[in-house]
Design a protein with these regions (language model features):
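Extracytoplasmic catalytic/substrate-binding loops of multi-pass membrane glycan-assembly enzymes
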Residues: 26-41, 51-69, 76-79, 234-235, ...
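Membrane-lumen/periplasm interface segments of specific transmembrane helices
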Residues: 209-282, 382-385, 461-468
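Hydrophobic/aromatic-rich transmembrane helices and adjacent perimembrane loops
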Residues: 185, 322-337, 381, 388-417
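Short periplasmic/luminal acceptor-recognition loop of GT-C membrane glycosyltransferases, typified by
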Residues: 58, 468-545, 555-576, 605-612
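Membrane-interface alpha helices of multi-pass inner-membrane proteins
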Residues: 165-181, 187-195, 216, 220, ...
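Membrane-interface transmembrane helices that cradle and orient dolichyl/undecaprenyl
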Residues: 142-168, 195, 200-202, 276-299, ...
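Transmembrane-helix motifs of polytopic, lipid-linked glycan transferases
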Residues: 83-107, 111-112, 117-122, 149-153, ...
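Perimembrane helix-loop-helix junctions
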Residues: 2-3, 186-222, 226, 237, ...
Length: 637
């Protein structure tokens, strides 16, 4: 009965998921930036194109190949990706809830699940895509999900010592290699922690055999993809294909670009360090005051209510969408308190811990997963450098650290504040309902009030994030695309991008042949997908991929297979080192010169793109392409 009741904490997560789905239905994607590639590349692969040969991709091959298979089975539609992502998000929520329930309690696990739900469906910036339903990179999303599965398997391996969980963990790590480098590096950290923990109780030979098993299982997915690519190209190219996410880093890391300097805080490191200290100090004051006042035996009910109201009021009025600078410091505190829990729950003295091999039954299994999760949080947060935040890329990279902070505030910190009691051991300590009995502490009334105040503080913050997202979603009422490909984007009065993209797609479908080819510069592969027009060059996103492939290489691809039409779309390139695409050498200048010599304009909507910042789309046809019939220059509504 208790085991069934422990799952009741998932009900609030389900309610939040339904509410947030209704709030942002089909409003998660951006019509211009990034997400078009997430649709266009799998569509091309489902029609027989070869990844990294016919169409480029900055990231690994796993996600696009998975989506291409879905398109082949269920048909080409945004709905297919939405259904897949919803199922994966639900699986991720239940898995993380179950894992934290085992190492904490229902309140902590439920709050963590709610926080993940809010992040998964949020829009914290004016640009979409930074969510789990229509992500800017499915490789990031899938890699993190696989990392969580890997950690669940590693925790089971540490608990039971069986080979199957380890083999599955190795397979997950191999799949993560095919997503994004930062996720793979982040996943290696908990794997290393698991090996260190096992080293304390396994012989060198047994540990070597275990690692060999993990390595072999990790190579299986790589071998499978290598065989698939080998059927389309030679062995050297196939080997490069399975390393597709890593090869651009050999030419340039992109760290010199303004977007990455701002993301990592390298543009103003001392400012971000100061902000982290201020944020951490403010949180410490709030938590300290709650602990000081609410744990007193003489606390009056009215004072308790006032503290609860103050905690909620402070939180709901704080700018959570820009928060996260103090996450590294919170992770350090969480690691210290986890270490304390580990040592106090250990049945041997410190000296015996250092000298003796330990038997399986002497280990406190609920503490395994938090150790792995904290290692993953540290490693993934490292890419954000001095500027950790839960918005933008932080929706993915800071998510584990954000959940770790909740685990610290609702579980580790209250256990630290509790008074020691005689040790209580459960006959079945791995049951979720008994997880609270495994430590050395009991909960008193004052700490229940303290946890309630922290819970109110966190829930108010999640409400603030939801309200912030809803303000963006309220402005979105313009449909782009139709049927299963429909995206709801900003009203033209707020942002003309969606309306201009819809007009451009309609013009292309009306005035060009279905077999005509199209390239969008410097961004805009959504047009290719919506109109089902192929880009004959491998280049998908000229503006954001120049740093990886080089302008001359991309220009050579265009000259070799010139598209029938080119859509030039307004795009701010300042994040990549220039005010606009085509203004300077190395950032589209030669490409735009080539376009000017070989193409002539046939249609314009809005302002002249890449000139004065006003949004507009101009379509040009190749000089050898027959002139299309149709209107010459409609205006924006």
């Amino acid at each position: 009965m208790k085991k069934k009741l422990s799952w009741l904490g998932a009900i609030p997560m389900g309610i939040a998921l339904i509410l947030l789905t209704w709030l942002g239905w089909r409003k998660w994607a951006d019509p211009l930036i990034d997400f078009g590639q997430q649709l266009y590349v799998p569509w091309r692969l489902s029609r027989g194109a070869v990844l990294y040969h016919d169409v480029s991709c900055l990231y690994g091959c796993l996600s696009v190949c998975y989506h291409a298979v879905l398109f082949k089975i269920f048909g080409v539609s945004l709905n297919v990706l939405l259904a897949s992502n919803f199922l994966i998000v639900i699986f991720l929520l239940l898995l993380i809830y179950r894992l934290f329930l085992k190492c904490s309690d229902a309140w902590t696990a439920t709050t963590i699940g709610l926080a993940l739900t809010v992040l998964a469906f949020s829009q914290l910036l004016d640009v979409g895509n930074y969510n789990y339903i229509c992500p800017y990179s499915h490789e990031e999303f899938h890699g993190i999900v696989l990392a969580v599965v890997m950690m669940a398997c590693l925790a089971r391996w540490l608990e039971a010592g069986r080979k199957l969980p380890l083999a599955l963990a190795g397979g997950c790590l191999g799949l993560i290699f095919l997503t994004k480098p930062e996720v793979f590096v982040g996943a290696v950290a908990p794997f290393a922690v698991a090996v260190i923990l096992q080293w304390r109780r396994l012989s060198v030979l047994d540990l070597a055999k275990a690692l060999l098993l993990a390595v072999v299982c990790g190579l299986i997915p790589l071998a499978g993809f290598f065989a698939g690519f080998r059927s389309e190209m030679n062995s050297a190219d196939a080997a490069r294909a399975i390393c597709g996410a890593w090869l651009p880093l050999l030419h340039s890391t992109g760290l010199q670009l303004p977007i990455y300097r701002a993301m990592t805080g390298m543009d103003a490191p001392w400012h971000h360090i100061a902000q982290a200290l201020i944020e951490f100090s403010g949180l410490a004051v709030i938590v300290g005051l709650c602990a000081w006042r609410l744990t007193r035996p003489t606390l009056k009910p009215l004072e308790r209510v006032l503290i609860f109201a103050a905690a909620g009021g402070v939180s709901v009025n704080y700018g959570w969408q820009s928060a996260g600078h103090c996450l590294p410091l919170l992770l350090v505190v969480a690691a210290i308190l986890w270490r304390r829990e580990w040592r106090r729950s250990f049945q041997f003295s410190v000296s015996s811990f250092q000298t003796e091999h330990l038997k399986l039954e002497t280990w406190n299994s609920p503490l395994f997963f938090p150790a792995l999760w904290l290692a993953f949080s540290f490693a993934l947060l490292a890419k954000l450098g001095f500027n950790p935040h839960i918005s933008h890329y932080g929706v993915f990279l800071a998510m584990p650290a954000f959940l770790s902070a909740i685990y610290l505030l609702l579980h580790l910190l209250p256990r630290f504040l509790q008074s020691p009691r005689p040790e209580v051991h459960s006959p079945q300590p791995d049951r979720p309902s008994d997880a609270g009995q495994i430590g050395l502490w009991t909960v008193d009334c004052g700490l229940k009030s303290f946890r309630a105040a922290i819970l109110i503080f966190l829930l108010a913050g999640l409400a603030r994030l939801t309200i912030h997202s809803s303000l963006f979603y309220t402005d979105k009422d313009f449909p782009l695309g139709s049927g299963g490909d429909r995206i709801v984007t900003y009203d033209p009065k707020v942002d003309p991008t969606g309306a201009a993209m819809a007009s451009a797609a309609a013009w292309i479908e009306t005035n060009t042949a279905p077999t005509s080819t199209l390239a969008a510069l410097p961004q805009g592969s959504m047009l290719n997908y919506l109109t089902r027009r192929i880009n004959p060059t491998p280049c998908v996103a000229f503006g954001s991929e120049l740093w990886a492939y080089g302008e001359q290489n991309m220009l050579a691809d265009c000259a070799k297979n010139p598209p029938d039409y080119i859509a030039i779309i307004q795009w701010d390139g300042s994040e990549f080192g220039a005010p606009r695409f085509g203004l300077q050498k190395g950032f589209g200048y030669d490409v735009m010169q080539w376009v000017g010599k070989n193409y002539q304009p046939v249609w314009l909507i809005g302002g002249e793109p890449l000139q004065n910042g006003a949004f507009g789309i101009k379509i040009l046809k190749h000089l050898s392409t027959p002139v299309p019939a149709g209107p010459a220059k409609p205006a924006l509504p």
